[in-house]
Swiss-Prot record:
The keyword RNA-binding does not apply. The keyword Transferase applies. Disruption phenotype: Does not affect the methylation of the naphthoquinones derived pigments and only abolishes the production of pleosporalin A but not of the 2 other final products. Transmembrane segments: none annotated. Pathway: Pigment biosynthesis; Secondary metabolite biosynthesis. This is Methyltransferase pgmE. SUPFAM superfamilies: S-adenosyl-L-methionine-dependent methyltransferases. Induction: Expression is significantly up-regulated at the end of late growth phase, in the presence of Butyrolactone I. Expression is positively regulated by the pgm cluster-specific transcription factor pgmR. Methyltransferase; part of the gene cluster that mediates the biosynthesis of pleosporalin A, ascomycone A, as well as a third cryptic naphthoquinone derived pigment, all responsible for the coloration of conidia. Essential for the production of pleosporalin A, but not the 2 other final products. The pathway begins with the biosynthesis of the cyclized heptaketide 3-acetonyl-1,6,8-trihydroxy-2-naphthaldehyde by the NR-PKS pgmA. CDD domains: AdoMet_MTases. Keywords: Methyltransferase, S-adenosyl-L-methionine, Transferase. Its EC number is 2.1.1.-. Gene3D superfamilies: Vaccinia Virus protein VP39.
Amino acid sequence: MAETATRSDSGMFWKATTYKEQYWDGYLAARPKYSSDFYERIVDYYKAHNPSPPTPTVAHDVGTGPGQVASELCKYFDKVIASDPNSTHLAVASARNEKSGLNHKITWTEVSAEDLNSHYPAGSASFLAAAECLPLLDVPRALNTFAHLLHPNGTLAAWFYGRPVFSEPTVAAKCQPILNDIIDLTFEKVIKGAPPAHKTTWKRSTDTLYSFLDNVTFPAETWRDVYRFKWNPHLPLSVVGPNACDYPIEPSSCIDPEREKVVEAKDPHFWEEVWDISEVRRFVECLLPNIEDLKSKGVYDHVEVKYKELEEAMGGDNAKKEITWPVVLILATRV
């Protein structure tokens, strides 16, 4: 395969622009695994609010990335439309689903979430998933597009997870501040050196994540039965912290308590992983596909010092520690 080149399309994260399978294997291995009961919660909501959908049933996976959510949706829907603005992501997702024999159910579309309404007709979908992407979008435009795509009683499911967090309190006290420093040091040059347009995108996203998506508005004339499920909401949802940013972080909330239900749970075992230092490193480094280029230029040396510090705090090279995640899931029904 060709080496991975990178670009910064959205101003949010560096995106791979050529298909290098090794990177994507590492990316998926470094991500939390969406549990079966998590998907069941979503599907149960969909079935309860849309008992007689038009057939064939159509689901959208917006911002599909390497396509793991599209694969899961094939279990529940007749057709799946997986979209992403990055052609490399679509090539990866298509190749992976070809191996699984699922491509006959999936249509791959290169388009941004905000512009899907120019590709698909109104009311053409029963379900739309926006996994790990909503804060990275122009949210009002994206929600208008999602409302355009969904037929009445169709379901929107949007979720996001934050940085990995050490579960056990004594371990977290020693290790989490070091991991937070590693992430912030890794990203500060990307954020602080961003051009103005990208900086605006970074701030918008950071504000939304520090709000735990509570600043995402669901107008009553368009959406009903809005549920906001939060796991570990005492932990920051944003991957980057204030030290990586050179702008004020301004969380806010527009939750309507008369129309929306918020369900919170503190669960140190939610999507639990057990990681050693190499797996923690993999999570951070897979956020930036050009990490090897940064290392070769020497701009990553100060971060390596922090990794050694974290390794010692975790108990050495082979020591494994429990990891959990802050997560938010929003479910809403199209009026």
